[in-house]
């Protein structure tokens, strides 16, 4: 079989046929969808380095200490709340149309802080940015599921996590560099989607699926909510674990006496690399079932968190970050593939939106829960230790409760 991306990786389901004129997806479509998938990362991390400057700029605003962090976190919460609705619209109307509109609006509201004069108006623009990110993430992931099937779909969903992990490191560096020119400067990067809109309009298409002898469905096929319950519940907790050390590692390092920003950045980059390696490994392991992979992934993450808790020595903390990064990098595509592989074309947008929403709610809850645990156990490192123990319990729970008869992750139904 040729290694070029193709829609023909596995047989189509019985009773369905593809249009004779339907196009075949290839590298251009993959590059566009993976690049657009990074926009939610851009929204999440780009302005983190300039938050102190924003706080200083709006120091006279009432509640500035609460409002400035919301500028960073608002998009994640909004994605969590609106992604299922974005999936509904994508299924009901048209994936491509929703994606292109969201890309244009993303650029408009993303760059709005360049000229907005109040903290409240900036937060409103960030809320609207989150709505756009929800639509973009849901449509891109859904289209990857539409265009490819079988092992190749698993490979590209893992690649989506890998690219997002690498882009987070790049965007943090860009945000810091642009921030030297003022706190508004990083917001110029939100024009990037406009560079993708024209290629997307030409190269991305709305797939169509026909049942033999029938017209296209006008009514939405019901989503198997019970089937999605287990993947989404595990994803909610997985999102908390995934973002815990990603957000808190720099605070841990500062707490053990590290003052060099280069050292903090270097260890954070090592963890990001481990996450990328974990995501890249998924393609080789997708022949296994969730019941096999989830205990390993949660187990590695738990080991890393406990190591970070157990020592103030940098080599031990770094090793813990590597274990957790690798485990969560492998975890994310496992959870995504587990959720979407069992969905039919007509259900995929809503199912993907629900999964995306639960992941980002987990991301939003992660620092809040760790702050609450920290207050109860006397510090951030002990809180990470508690999360490590809970994650170890999750590893055992998935081994015992996830169904034995789950399909391999490289087997698709549509």
Located regions from the model:
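Extracellular/periplasmic helix-loop-helix junction of adjacent transmembrane segments
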Residues: 50-80
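Conserved MFS/SLC helix-loop-helix module at the cytosolic interface between two early adjacent transmembrane helices
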Residues: 80-118
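Helix-to-loop junctions at the C-terminal end of transmembrane segments
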Residues: 82-94, 277-290
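Structural signature of the two symmetry-related core transmembrane helices
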Residues: 97-111, 292-307
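Paired small-residue
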Residues: 109, 120-128, 315-323
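Cytoplasmic helix-loop-helix junction between adjacent transmembrane helices
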Residues: 119, 125-164
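Helix-loop-helix hairpin linking two adjacent transmembrane segments in secondary transporters
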Residues: 150-151, 159-205
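A late C-terminal transmembrane helix in Major Facilitator Superfamily
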Residues: 342-378
């Amino acid at each position: 079989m040729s290694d070029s991306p193709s829609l023909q990786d596995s047989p189509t389901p019985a009773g369905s046929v593809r249009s004779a004129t339907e196009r075949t997806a290839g590298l251009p479509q993959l590059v566009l969808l993976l690049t657009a998938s990074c926009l939610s990362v851009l929204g999440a991390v780009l302005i983190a380095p300039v938050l102190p400057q924003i706080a200083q700029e709006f120091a006279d605003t009432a509640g500035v200490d609460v409002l400035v962090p919301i500028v960073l976190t608002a998009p994640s919460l909004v994605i969590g709340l609106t992604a299922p609705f974005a999936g509904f619209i994508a299924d009901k109307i048209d994936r491509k149309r929703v994606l292109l509109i969201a890309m244009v609006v993303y650029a408009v509201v993303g760059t709005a802080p360049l000229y907005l004069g109040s903290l409240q108006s900036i937060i409103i623009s960030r809320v609207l940015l989150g709505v756009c990110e929800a639509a973009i993430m849901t449509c891109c992931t859904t289209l990857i599921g539409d265009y490819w099937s079988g092992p190749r779909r698993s490979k590209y969903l893992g690649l989506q996590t890998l690219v997002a992990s690498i882009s987070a490191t790049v965007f943090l560096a860009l945000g810091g560099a642009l921030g030297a020119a003022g706190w508004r400067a990083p917001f110029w990067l939100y024009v990037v989607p406009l560079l993708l809109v024209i290629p997307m309009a030409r190269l991305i298409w709305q797939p169509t699926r026909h049942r033999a002898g029938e017209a296209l469905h006008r009514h939405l096929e019901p989503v198997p909510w019970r089937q999605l319950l287990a993947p989404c519940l595990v994803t909610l907790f997985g999102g908390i674990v995934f973002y815990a050390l990603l957000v808190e590692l720099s605070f841990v390092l500062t707490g053990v006496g590290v003052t060099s920003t280069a050292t903090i950045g270097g260890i954070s980059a090592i963890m990001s690399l481990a996450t990328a390696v974990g995501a890249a490994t998924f393609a080789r392991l997708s022949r296994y079932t969730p019941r096999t992979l989830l205990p390993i992934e949660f187990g590695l993450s738990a080991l890393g968190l406990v190591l970070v808790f157990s020592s103030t020595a940098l080599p031990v903390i770094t090793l813990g970050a590597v274990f957790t990064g690798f485990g969560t990098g492998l975890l994310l595509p496992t959870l995504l593939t587990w959720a979407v592989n069992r969905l039919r074309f007509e259900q995929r947008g809503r199912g993907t939106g629900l999964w995306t929403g639960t992941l980002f709610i987990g991301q939003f809850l992660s620092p809040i829960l760790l702050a609450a645990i920290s207050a109860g156990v006397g510090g951030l490192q002990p809180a990470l230790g508690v999360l490590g123990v809970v994650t170890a319990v999750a590893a055992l729970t998935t081994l015992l409760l996830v169904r034995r008869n789950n399909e391999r992750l490289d087997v698709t139904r549509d």
